[in-house]
Amino acid sequence: MAENGTISVEELKRLLEQWNLVIGFIFLAWIMLLQFAYSNRNRFLYIIKLVFLWLLWPVTLACFVLAAVYRINWVTGGIAIAMACIVGLMWLSYFVASFRLFARTRSMWSFNPETNILLNVPLRGTILTRPLMESELVIGAVIIRGHLRMAGHSLGRCDIKDLPKEITVATSRTLSYYKLGASQRVGTDSGFAAYNRYRIGNYKLNTDHSGSNDNIALLVQ
């Protein structure tokens, strides 16, 4: 350590040599999360990624608050206060949007920090909800050897004749309806179908699915 409290080049080089292995593992973990942590690929890594994203908000806010409290000068203190306010408002808007989406879908996927778009598929007497990165005009459904995949998500076993007549895509502000259009069976247990968006409005999902698959949304009054 130099006399003025700074770290010399040799000391910095020694620290890097000692911590190279740990730094390598940290970067490898980030690479795995960024490259493989998708909801339709590896659910375990995806959950870890979501936990990291959730923790980044309070940690970032705490860093700016501490930077404002223990400011170097008034300029850095002012910047830290401004950034703390911005991060706080962004975090608050995330919670507002998440609770609005939860009120619409009753799904814990509503608190996903990566996206606020949810696909809702009524299947086998229940509604399967999965996250989407964007809302499309057409959503494809593929059945391969009796297993249904929709928008990249595996939804379990299903025959093409048992596909729901209607699915929805929910955001914090709207609920979009998609109607089953063209469908084609391929072989005995495979096939494909397309759902076309035909209506959008301020609705909430009808989680009571004991009746018909056709009525899966209720108008928000």
Curated annotation (Swiss-Prot):
Disulfide partners: none
Ranges per topology, Intravirion: 40-49, 100-221
Short name of any one Pfam family annotated for the protein: CoV_M
GO-annotated molecular function: structural constituent of virion
Transmembrane segments: 19-39, 50-70, 79-99
Ranges per topology, Virion surface: 1-18, 71-78
UniProtKB keywords: Glycoprotein, Host Golgi apparatus, Host membrane, Host-virus interaction, Membrane, Transmembrane, Transmembrane helix, Viral envelope protein, Viral immunoevasion, Viral matrix protein, Virion
Location in the cell: Virion membrane; Host Golgi apparatus membrane
Protein's membrane topology: Multi-pass membrane protein
PROSITE patterns: COV_M (PS51927)
Primary location: virion
Listed GO CC annotations: host cell Golgi membrane; membrane; viral envelope; virion membrane
Keyword Transmembrane: yes
HAMAP family linked to this entry: BETA_CORONA_M (MF_04202)
Role of this protein: Component of the viral envelope that plays a central role in virus morphogenesis and assembly via its interactions with other viral proteins.
Additional comment: Bat coronavirus rp3 is highly similar to SARS-CoV (SARS-like).
Record note on quaternary structure: Homomultimer. Interacts with envelope E protein in the budding compartment of the host cell, which is located between endoplasmic reticulum and the Golgi complex. Forms a complex with HE and S proteins. Interacts with nucleocapsid N protein. This interaction probably participates in RNA packaging into the virus.
Protein family: Belongs to the betacoronaviruses M protein family.
Protein name as annotated: Membrane protein
Gene: M
